[in-house]
């Protein structure tokens, strides 16, 4: 199996096993190739905080999940040791948030 096919299979298996990503948060895996992944999440009512904007924890979860798919695309278990995020502007109900993770 070539590395692109392996990465796609890893992404499918990870997504199938990750109920939090798929069901609880409602993210979609758009692509998973060697060292790269892209995901999306449409901001739903369940994602809104008291200011009626997307809770930062959901945005961080989307980024972290994208990172996980990219880093695990070679079929070697990997987890984050540390990460940080800068929020540039709020996301609102119905916004489509798209992420791309690239291995460095």
Where are these regions (language model features)?
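Terminal targeting signals and extreme-terminal segments of soluble enzymes
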Residues: 1-104
């Amino acid at each position: 199996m070539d590395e692109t096919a392996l990465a796609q299979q890893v992404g499918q298996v990870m997504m199938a096993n990750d109920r939090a990503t798929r069901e609880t948060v409602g993210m979609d895996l758009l692509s998973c190739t060697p060292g790269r992944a892209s995901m999306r999440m449409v901001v739903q009512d369940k994602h809104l905080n008291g200011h009626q904007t997307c809770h930062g924890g959901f945005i961080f979860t989307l980024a972290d999940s994208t990172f996980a798919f990219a880093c695990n695309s070679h079929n070697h278990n990997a987890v984050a040791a540390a990460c940080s995020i800068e929020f540039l502007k709020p996301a609102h109900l119905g916004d489509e948030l798209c992420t791309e993770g690239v291995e460095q």
